[in-house]
Amino acid sequence: MPALSPAKKGTDKGKTGKKTGKQEQNAQDYIPPPPPMPGDEAFAMPIREIVKPDNQLWLSEADLNEEVAKMLTANNPAAPKNIVRFNMKDKVFKLEPMVEQTVVHYATDGWLLHKSSDEAKRQMDMEKMEQEASARFQADIDRASHEHKDHGDVEPPDDSRQLRNQFNFSERAAQTLNYPLRDRETFTEPPPTATVSGACTQWEIYDEYIKDLERQRIDEAMKSKGGKKAAAAARAAGAAHRQRNEHVPTLQSPTLMHSLGTLDRMVNQNMYEEVAMDFKYWDDASDAFRPGEGSLLPLWRFVSDKSKRRQVTSVCWNPLYDDMFAVGYGSYEFLKQASGLINIYSLKNPSHPEYTFHTESGVMCVHFHPEFANLLAVGCYDGSVLVYDVRLKKDEPIYQASVRTGKLNDPVWQIYWQPDDAQKSLQFVSISSDGAVNLWTLTKSELIPECLMKLRVVRAGETREEEDPNASGAAGGCCMDFCKMPGQESIYLVGTEEGAIHRCSKAYSSQYLSTYVSHHLAVYAVHWNNIHPSMFLSASCRLDHQAVGLCHDPKRAVMNFDLNDSIGDVSWAALQPTVFAAVTDDGRVHVFDLAQNKLLPLCSQKVVKKAKLTKLVFNPKHPIVLVGDDKGCVTSLKLSPNLRITSKPEKGQKFEDLEVAKLDGVVEIARKSDADLAKNAAH
């Protein structure tokens, strides 16, 4: 070991700083060795000298004993933090928030295998088989050596002589005579050939059937009394029919259009397969964890190029096909009137309407006939009423009210088909702003109107006996609805511009049965409950923000629901008698269930943006609802399980009686709460 430099005296005195307690303790513990004897310098003990830099930091005892926490993180400091990738959905570059933080310092492929792995088991089995084979081979060698020792010395066989296989070896060769090859040919004339081709298609089969039917018709004409003249007439009619079909262009033939429609529907079904599965099988699983709340699932959106920038004024389901509905387009604004449009859509083809009809004025209401599903009654803004036959696929109506046949002067707001038990003819009822409730009868050539009721203003405090039709002024009609209870089909409700709702009958055209005054402004929607004979909804849409449930016995509102926005429409659910919904101008759909919550909606969901909802209608067989807006779009929504809870009647109990009892209970509770509030106000 090299000798250390000699100690320096006064080294610590000139340095800045202060010695710590530990350093002083070490300095006190150190005892320098004794000086060496003369002549023993080579064997002297080394002297330890503590060499310190001039800029060394002096720390106190507390600083030295302080614990410094070290934190290990899993973040890679070398990982990039500004990676961006192109988002194909939004068509923009977006920052990638998640970056791989793994750092590989060393990696090698190991050769060790776990004993329980499949590959290790296979290797151990192979080694075991090799060991067993080696053991058997060694045992055979040992056994042979023992046998050789037992038998003594045996001379080995002489392998010098070559052995021949007597089965494969022939010592002598023999050659035989090979006969030469001979060819024998014959030449004949080939039989004549002909190319025959043909095609069998549906239209060729159809043409053959038509020809066969024509031959049968000619044969029957020959056998009849007319003889040759009748046969000639039948032959001429068949020739004219063929000539007419031949002049139809191929691209305009009905068969081609039908085939293209089928192909278009198949393509749409493949495109919207997921939506169709949601329509059939979707149920919101979260409803099980949030009782008293529900949701609406958007399904299809129905809009066409011609319906854009038009307001949806009416929606009606077809009574025969539960997947088909008609939509009427018009305008509620007086200064923005234009031509009308009617689109008939199907849930199987949401891309295009099945049928389209145009009207000169805006369409305000549509209604399918409940028995003859091909007849569609239409009311327009200019006061005209039309009847279309959807099967004809023609843009012209089969019936239209003209000025000569009693065309109305004001907009027709509501229209309903009505049965005629006496004459067995087709009839429908309309209501317009001029206060006329007309009954229209379809004859062979025209529409015949009949005035059922002339609405008039009822003064406050006036009784039914004091009513004077000549003294009171005319009231403007806005909406109507017929009672759906058996035996009461002739009773209907009428909403007026004065805020009154009149209960009328087709049998009494001079007086109101009763009058309800629950709104301060015009009533634009009124709907009777499907099973309760005295419960109905009314709404003063777009004006006083209230949807009101009424019971006709006390002639006053039983329950009021303030939705804090202008209401577009209100309607009862077809499958749940205690459920109703309303749409507002802010694009929300409010769904109420009086059996679960009598004050607040179970669902208040925004379904459209930058649009006002104008119409609402429930499907009569499926738990879906259609809502229309002022942009010409119709959206279909599916109700979650909490929004379509129905009562399960016990054995011997009817579903209708149970639901009526529930509604009566709701009315009774509302009456008691009103009575308690009146008592508290009196005190």
Swiss-Prot record:
Superkingdom in the source lineage: Eukaryota
InterPro entries in UniProt: Dynein_IC, WD40/YVTN_repeat-like_dom_sf, WD40_repeat_dom_sf, WD40_rpt
Disordered: region residues: 1-42
WD repeats: 358-398, 407-450, 562-602, 608-647
Assigned keywords, A-Z: Cell projection, Cilium, Cytoplasm, Cytoskeleton, Dynein, Flagellum, Microtubule, Motor protein, Repeat, WD repeat
Disulfide cysteine pairs (residue numbers): none
CC terms in the record's Gene Ontology section: cytoplasm; dynein complex; microtubule; motile cilium
Subcellular locations according to the entry: Cytoplasm, Cytoskeleton, Flagellum axoneme
Oligomeric form and interacting partners: Consists of at least 3 heavy chains (alpha, beta and gamma), 2 intermediate chains and 8 light chains.
Family label: Belongs to the dynein intermediate chain family.
Cited function: Is essential for arm assembly or attachment to the outer doublet microtubule.
Record-given protein name: Dynein, 78 kDa intermediate chain, flagellar outer arm
Organism taxonomic ancestry: Eukaryota, Viridiplantae, Chlorophyta, core chlorophytes, Chlorophyceae
